[in-house]
């Protein structure tokens, strides 16, 4: 029987299935960070248990770490306690951790693939919703809660039911000036933030195959914003080449055996999905969110929508609240919206290709006078090192951007990098909820190139015609 990629990954990890469909699923890789792990480790200790398989765990502090003056340590006592607790727990149980001053430290969803700790065919979990990122590598990856973190530590398994399957097929050549970020924002604009609820999404089609592995990670990262718990892309030669020489990747005969298996990780011809969405890449333009949900998104050449034209009462009310929070008026051209801050980073867009794309726009220009701060935060120490080898840091610094240390940074208001009330930010992150980047902060989601262009222009511009 023809199987989807999701079927193959799921079936390969089912240890036991109950009559009601509840399955005991084996977990290959468990990624840990400082925010959702302390209570899990405490529960483990109180029960007198040890991690079932120490080597399956990899830890890194990312949410609370400072991206400036790191040598001075963490100023906030709660943030410092969370990071110190992760250090102590990993030392206690012998879990591999990339500590704050380790070159390999970075955002958990950047360092996992970067190290080859995430591999095709794996089940990958982390106490973080954007674990879906790792599905871009042909893995089944999803976020879990703190109690589940403890369960995985103790048993290397999870109890769960299989989701429905959805295929989002994107066909055609991606237009000039458009990126993976624009692809996924466009998709969310079509299906909404609940469109993928209850489903595992496989992204497929010539457009997805044309993306780099890092671009695919951007798309899968935001599968959760489409309502799905996981997103994935079939393995191809790009995937396999990506893992050659990675520290955790197999070598020698084991590499050959792994590659043989990885090449089976695709949906079979004739495999049936519960839902199929077809997207024409020719319809995609550079995207900008205007509201307080990723589904509130439009092409950059659009205008802020008018709630009075919305017939659905619930949607109209949501639009009105979003416009009030964002301080925007209906029918305002998106290119007329000025920005106060620019953030290039996050687990969505902080990899080397993202920084290169932003640097192309920033080269030889200056951050606009009305922009109070523009920062670039690499996704890991290794990404930062590579960018500096290529001279990208100099391009950004000469243009007036701040060049920071790796971490989650301004993606969320959990560290020193945050917006002040009323400040408007062009951000390459994944969520634009009220207060996400700081109480009263206003977030617009864009691609790295669009963010860099907004920094230079002082307002949103169409990167396709930006000079």
Curated annotation (Swiss-Prot):
The keyword Oxidoreductase does not apply. It catalyses: (2R,3S)-3-isopropylmalate = (2S)-2-isopropylmalate. Keywords: 4Fe-4S, Amino-acid biosynthesis, Branched-chain amino acid biosynthesis, Iron, Iron-sulfur, Leucine biosynthesis, Lyase, Metal-binding. One of its GO terms (molecular function) is 3-isopropylmalate dehydratase activity. GO terms for biological process: L-leucine biosynthetic process. Binds 1 [4Fe-4S] cluster per subunit. It is an enzyme of class 4 (lyase). SUPFAM superfamilies: Aconitase iron-sulfur domain. Pathway: Amino-acid biosynthesis; L-leucine biosynthesis; L-leucine from 3-methyl-2-oxobutanoate: step 2/4. PANTHER family: 3-ISOPROPYLMALATE DEHYDRATASE (PTHR43822:SF9), HOMOACONITASE, MITOCHONDRIAL-RELATED (PTHR43822). Catalyzes the isomerization between 2-isopropylmalate and 3-isopropylmalate, via the formation of 2-isopropylmaleate. Heterodimer of LeuC and LeuD. This is 3-isopropylmalate dehydratase large subunit. The gene is leuC.
């Amino acid at each position: 029987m023809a199987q989807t990629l999701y079927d193959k990954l799921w079936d390969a990890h089912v240890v036991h299935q109950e009559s009601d469909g509840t399955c005991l699923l084996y977990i290959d890789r468990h990624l840990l960070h400082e925010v959702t792990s302390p209570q899990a480790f405490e529960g483990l200790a109180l029960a007198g248990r040890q991690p079932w398989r120490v080597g399956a765990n990899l830890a890194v502090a990312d949410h609370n770490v400072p991206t400036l003056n790191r040598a001075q340590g963490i100023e906030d006592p709660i943030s410092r306690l969370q990071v110190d607790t992760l250090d102590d727990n990993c030392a206690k149980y012998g879990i591999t951790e990339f500590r704050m001053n380790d070159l390999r430290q970075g955002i958990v969803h950047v360092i996992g693939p970067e190290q080859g700790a995430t591999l095709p065919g794996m089940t990958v979990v982390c106490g973080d919703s954007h674990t879906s990122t790792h599905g871009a590598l042909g893995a089944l990856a999803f976020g879990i809660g703190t109690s589940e973190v403890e369960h995985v530590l103790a048993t290397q398994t999870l109890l769960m039911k299989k989701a429905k399957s959805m295929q989002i097929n994107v066909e055609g050549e991606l237009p000039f000036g458009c990126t993976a970020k624009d692809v996924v924002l466009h998709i969310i604009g079509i299906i909404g933030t609940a469109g993928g609820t209850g489903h595992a999404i496989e992204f497929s089609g010539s457009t997805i195959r044309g993306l780099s592995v890092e671009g695919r990670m951007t798309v899968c990262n935001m599968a959760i914003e489409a309502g799905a718990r996981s997103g994935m892309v079939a393995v191809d030669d790009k995937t396999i080449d990506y893992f050659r020489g990675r520290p955790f990747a197999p070598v020698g005969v084991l590499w050959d055996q792994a590659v043989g298996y990885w090449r089976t990780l695709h949906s079979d011809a004739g495999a049936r999905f519960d839902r199929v969405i077809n997207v024409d890449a020719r319809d995609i333009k550079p995207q900008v969110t205007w509201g307080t949900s990723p589904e509130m998104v439009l092409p950059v050449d659009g205008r802020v929508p008018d709630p009075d034209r919305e017939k659905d009462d619930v949607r109209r009310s949501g639009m009105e609240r979003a416009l009030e929070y964002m301080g925007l008026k209906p029918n305002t051209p998106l290119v007329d919206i000025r920005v106060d801050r620019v953030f290039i980073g996050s687990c969505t867009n902080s990899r080397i290709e993202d920084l290169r794309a932003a640097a192309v726009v920033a080269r030889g220009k200056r951050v606009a006078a009305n922009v109070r701060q523009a920062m670039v935060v690499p996704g890991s120490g290794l990404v930062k090192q590579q960018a500096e080898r290529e001279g990208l840091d100099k391009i950004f610094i000469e243009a007036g951007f701040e060049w920071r240390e790796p971490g989650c940074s301004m993606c969320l208001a959990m560290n020193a990098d945050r917006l002040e009330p009323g400040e408007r930010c062009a951000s390459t992150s994944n969520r634009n909820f009220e207060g996400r980047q700081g109480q009263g902060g206003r977030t617009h989601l864009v691609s790295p190139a669009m963010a860099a262009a907004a920094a230079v222009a002082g307002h949103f511009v169409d990167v396709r015609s930006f000079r």
